[in-house]
Amino acid sequence: MLTLDTLNVMLAVSEEGMVEEMILALLASPQLVIFFEKFPRLKNAVTADLPRWREALRSRLKDARVPQKLTEEVMCYQQSQLLSTPQFIVQLPQILALLHRLHSPYAAQAKQLVESNSTFTPSLHTLFLQRWRLSLVVQATTLNQQLLEEEREQLLSDVQERMTLSGQLEPTLAENDNAAGRLWDMSAGQLKRGDYQLIVKYGEFLAAQPELKQLAEQLGRSREAKSVPKKDAPMETFRTLVREPATVPEQVDGIQQSDDILRLLPPELATLGITELEYEFYRRLVEKQLLTYRLHGEAWREKVTERPVVHQDVDKQPRGPFIVCVDTSGSMGGFNEQCAKAFCLALMRVALADNRRCFIMLFSTEVVRYELSGPEGIEQAIRFLSQRFRGGTDIASCFRAIIERMQRRKWFDADAVVISDFIAQRLPDDVVSKVGELQRLHQHRFHAVAMSAHGKPGIMRIFDHIWRFDTGMRSRLLRRWRR
């Protein structure tokens, strides 16, 4: 069976303009406009998806099959082009019968054209084929538009689902444009509303515990380089780009009258296939009165200013991935569990903003792993937040898992974060020795987030930094009173 791509090539129909028109119409839809106004950070992330959308639409048009009736008509047209005028006159009754049988839009016009001329001349032969081809072009264009409309509805439905998900999670997980882009990429998974509401719930809990959120941000960015500007610096030229309006065709701004065929409205194109309106279409084309999409865009202009030269002495330190180990023993249940999960969510937020990896390991009697910064990060985060802290405490296994992962090439600059109340047995000497070696030779940093004031000093002595967040009732009341 004939493919739509082959038909477009045969009739010289360009689908590129229709694809671009559909993309522009999609971007101009009220749903996306409102979404971009509400979540401006996600606009760039959605825009970055446009090449993938275009490729998917082209692939859909390329693989689509042409209906059998249209295929037969196209084949008949192709064969008729090879006939001379005398041969064509002989085959004309069969051609008219075929057009009638196929219910071709050109059937009535072809019959009228033959009956209104007693003599079938070569010029009439040429006119017959030209109008037949025009009818086929209109049919092919209509078929392309029908398929694109179906794809637009499906694409809009998918985008709306992802917008709902991203919009719900943006306040919790998207700190900057980079995080918004990664969050949009993660939203491509199959998630239900009830699933990601768990992240929203812990995001609200984190917002109600500003000290916990601040602690996570301090820990996550504790490796930031320190810079000291020098004084009495000379002036230097500083160039910046300033945005200003332009006429670059970037997004739909309305409707105008012109002769731009590529941006023609579908109702205008439909008049081309109606015999009574055909000459009216060409008249309006010549007079530039066809209704088309009006586009506008933005341009950048270079602005030159003078400012003092600022040199900075920077002690750069690498900012690698997080390996977070969470104690899921029974003593970490209740409010401790909520704080530990919310703290991991805050670290995930930092990782997304700084383009870092965030790997979670739960330790009790066994080690369970989740990667919150991968393509399936949202699903992994939901699984992690769904866990219950009811196991035992095997902190030695946790450290062995950290050591084993840090020895891999991809994790050579990772930071380890252990979240626990540190009410556990002392660590074996071989584990303590290996941790010290990683700290000394490879500059790995080990952070402890202590959820209790009663953690054993012997365990916590091996950490580079100890971040305390006491979850006792007295400390909770004091924090609430200070707010």
Curated annotation (Swiss-Prot):
Top-level division of the source organism's lineage: Bacteria
InterPro entries: Uncharacterised_CoxE, Uncharacterised_ViaA, VWF_A, vWFA_dom_sf
Main location: cytoplasm
Keyword Transport in record: no
Gene3D superfamilies, per the entry: von Willebrand factor, type A domain
Swiss-Prot/TrEMBL keywords: Chaperone, Cytoplasm
Database matches in SUPFAM superfamilies: vWA-like
Cellular location(s): Cytoplasm
UniProt keyword Plastid present: no
Membrane-spanning intervals of the chain: none
Any Pfam family the entry gives: VWA_CoxE
GO CC annotation: cytosol
Assembly behavior: Homodimer. Interacts with RavA.
Function: Component of the RavA-ViaA chaperone complex, which may act on the membrane to optimize the function of some of the respiratory chains. ViaA stimulates the ATPase activity of RavA.
Family: Belongs to the ViaA family.
The protein's name: Regulatory protein ViaA
Species whose genome carries this gene: Salmonella arizonae (strain ATCC BAA-731 / CDC346-86 / RSK2980)
Gene symbol of the encoding locus: viaA
